[in-house]
């Protein structure tokens, strides 16, 4: 069974262009499924997977308290896997074809207020005044994530040549290997210049290659390190929600819309395939307006 899962993992990476994070999620979901199959049938085999068994698997997880979002993701993982197995001739009938994806309740993302975002940026900028390479790198991480709204995996995957400093744009390779160009402002440009001229040369080693961001040992920065940087930076801001890079992405999108940006432009900047995903941020701004109205209007 593991060899089949290895083949599916290769398909997700090479043909679907999924990130390592997404592929690990698929692998975890399918491993959990086949643990259940083996427990129920005594065989760890694709041939033993049936629609009733899949429904029992999801029902058991639901009864154990799995969130609706988790159930929806696992259903999607299984449906993608079974459809692939059918095309490869590994099964004659797709047992997941009629499996319904539970609708996940969409929750409004936690975002920073504008003043909180500026406080976080001020803090990370003040910490980079001494020329310490790690501080200069951390400044760039936060500035670039907020300026562009890119994903942390996209940030850590950037090479130096992906940055056009004269035009102040970054070329991003997003989900599905789709490339997009995202602009950034003067504060991020200043952070980038300081990192490239003062910070990166202090950490660079032959193994650094073209990577834009480096870890303390000179190799390409791991997304987990970038997440830690964002969490630590934001946690120092009084009253700010506990967010990481994805929360900073949410914040950038929300502030763009609050500033009057067109929804489809924001969709393009974020690399969303569906406009419906971007529209979630309009609900955030409406909720904020409602909160202000409730507090300030005498007839609220």
Swiss-Prot record:
Residues annotated as domain Core-binding (CB): 1-86
Active site: 151, 175, 246, 249, 272, 281
Subunit structure: Forms a cyclic heterotetrameric complex composed of two molecules of XerC and two molecules of XerD.
Domain Tyr recombinase, residue spans: 107-294
GO terms classed as biological process: cell division; chromosome segregation; DNA transposition
Entry's localization field: Cytoplasm
Superkingdom to which the source organism belongs: Bacteria
Listed GO MF terms: DNA binding; tyrosine-based site-specific recombinase activity
PANTHER family for the chain: PHAGE INTEGRASE-RELATED, TYROSINE RECOMBINASE XERC
Primary localization class, coarse: cytoplasm
Matching CDD domains: INT_XerDC_C
InterPro entries hit by this protein: CB (IPR044068), DNA_brk_join_enz (IPR011010), Integrase-like_cat_sf (IPR013762), Integrase_catalytic (IPR002104), Integrase_recombinase_N (IPR010998), Integrase_SAM-like_N (IPR004107), Tyrosine_recombinase_XerC/XerD (IPR023009), Tyrosine_recombinase_XerCD (IPR050090)
A Pfam family: Phage_integrase
Keyword presence, DNA-binding: yes
Transmembrane regions: none
Native organism taxonomy: Bacteria, Bacillati, Actinomycetota, Actinomycetes, Mycobacteriales
Keywords from the named record: Cell cycle, Cell division, Chromosome partition, Cytoplasm, DNA integration, DNA recombination, DNA-binding
Family note: Belongs to the 'phage' integrase family. XerC subfamily.
Function: Site-specific tyrosine recombinase, which acts by catalyzing the cutting and rejoining of the recombining DNA molecules. The XerC-XerD complex is essential to convert dimers of the bacterial chromosome into monomers to permit their segregation at cell division. It also contributes to the segregational stability of plasmids.
Protein's UniProt name: Tyrosine recombinase XerC
GO CC term, one of those recorded: cytoplasm
NCBIfam families from the UniProt entry: PRK00283.1
Disulfide-bonded cysteines: none
């Amino acid at each position: 069974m593991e060899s089949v899962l290895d083949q599916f993992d290769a398909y997700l990476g090479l043909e679907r262009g999924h990130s390592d994070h997404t592929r690990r999620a698929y692998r975890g979901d399918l491993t959990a499924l086949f643990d259940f199959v083996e427990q129920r049938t005594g065989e760890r085999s694709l041939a033993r997977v049936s629609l009733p068994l899949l429904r029992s698997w999801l029902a058991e997880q639901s009864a154990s308290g799995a969130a609706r979002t988790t159930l929806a993701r696992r259903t999607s993982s299984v449906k993608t896997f079974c459809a692939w197995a059918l095309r490869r001739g590994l099964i004659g009938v797709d047992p997941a074809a009629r499996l319904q994806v539970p609708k996940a309740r969409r929750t409004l993302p936690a975002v920073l207020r504008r003043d909180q975002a500026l406080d976080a940026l001020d803090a990370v900028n003040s910490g980079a005044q001494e020329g310490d390479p790690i501080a200069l790198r951390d400044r760039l991480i936060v500035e670039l994530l907020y300026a562009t709204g890119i994903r942390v995996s996209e940030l850590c995957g950037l090479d130096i040549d992906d940055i056009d400093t004269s035009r102040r744009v970054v070329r991003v390779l997003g989900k599905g290997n789709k490339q997009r160009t995202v602009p950034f402002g003067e504060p991020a440009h200043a952070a980038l210049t300081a990192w490239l001229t003062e910070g990166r040369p202090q950490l660079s080693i032959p193994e650094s290659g073209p990577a834009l961001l480096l870890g303390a040992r000179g190799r390409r920065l791991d997304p987990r390190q970038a997440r830690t940087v964002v969490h630590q930076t934001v946690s120092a801001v009084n009253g700010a929600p506990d967010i990481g890079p994805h929360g900073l992405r949410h914040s950038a999108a929300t502030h763009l819309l609050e500033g009057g940006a067109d929804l489809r432009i924001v969709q393009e900047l974020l690399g969303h395939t569906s406009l419906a995903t971007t529209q979630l941020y309009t609900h955030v701004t409406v909720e904020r307006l409602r909160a202000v109205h409730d507090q300030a209007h005498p007839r609220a």
